[in-house]
């Protein structure tokens, strides 16, 4: 996906979400803030949301049509125990791990 495929009014929001997630990394099975924010966004988009899947996982369900076909997307939310280099404005707050 490129910026040209995204509605212009969403680009700033999406950039903000990405930077926020990067600024607040959480290690595997400890992504409580991240999963809560993702669930909140999915609800705002009108999806049915299931939380606590496998611990901190989130599932968003978008119902369309007669339900005979399904599409699934998966994304990792966990950070890695790596020290971040550089100093961008979205630098991870705990510098001992990052996305």
Model-predicted regions and their roles:
Residues 98-99:
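Conserved small/polar residues in nucleotide/adenosyl-binding loops
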Residues 27-67:
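A non-catalytic alpha/beta surface segment that caps or lines the substrate-entry region
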Residues 17, 24, 28, 41-45, ...:
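Generic N-terminal helix/loop capping motif
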